[in-house]
Amino acid sequence: MSLKVAFLNENARAPTRGSVHAAGYDLYAAEEKTIPANGRGLVDLGLSMSIPEGTYARIAPRSGLAVKNGLSTGAGVIDYDYRGPVKVMLFNHSTEDFNVTIGDRVAQMILERIVTPEVQVVQTNDLESTERGAGGFGSTGINDEKKRKLDEAEAKE
């Protein structure tokens, strides 16, 4: 299995892993760009790729940029059949502009295997029941006492 990368301009760099056990490949900016404070910007990587069949690439933030500069990524899926230019959407959650320079590591790419089952529409009562049921939005992260109180409050409504 290989990840094929084609350079689209002279500033492009191939993705690299920071260590032999790193899950992600660092992605490098091929252009200078200012991400405005509390804003966003699309950063060109200057390359296109051939993702291995049976996988997709997920674009994720680099932890250092997130912690030190308040940057995160968005719109981060590269499908197996996409062959166009790869760009990274950066969100700047800080109150200061962030300047990207050519060669900066702006995100990481993680290859993940995918499963694409056939969609089958069924009635609600045909779904397998589970212990969790319809509990969501933090329902599994509360202690038993809080859960009991919430259940009692819902029963009164």
Swiss-Prot record:
GO function term, MF aspect, one: magnesium ion binding
This protein's encoding gene: DUT1
Catalytic reaction equation(s): dUTP + H2O = dUMP + diphosphate + H(+)
Top EC group: hydrolase
Subunit structure and binding partners: Homotrimer.
SUPFAM superfamilies given in the database record: dUTPase-like (SSF51283)
Pathway(s) per entry: Pyrimidine metabolism; dUMP biosynthesis; dUMP from dCTP (dUTP route): step 2/2
Names of the cofactor(s): Mg(2+)
Keyword Hydrolase: yes
Biased composition (Basic and acidic residues): 143-157
Record's protein name: Deoxyuridine 5'-triphosphate nucleotidohydrolase
UniProt-annotated stretches for the region Disordered: 125-157
Protein family (similarity comment): Belongs to the dUTPase family.
InterPro entries: dUTPase, dUTPase-like, dUTPase-like_sf, dUTPase_trimeric
Keywords assigned: Hydrolase, Magnesium, Metal-binding, Nucleotide metabolism
Enzyme Commission code: 3.6.1.23
Biological role stated in the UniProt entry: Involved in nucleotide metabolism via production of dUMP, the immediate precursor of thymidine nucleotides, and decreases the intracellular concentration of dUTP so that uracil cannot be incorporated into DNA.
Residues engaged in binding dUMP: S63, G76, D79, Y82, K87, R132, F137, G138
GO biological process: dUMP biosynthetic process; dUTP catabolic process
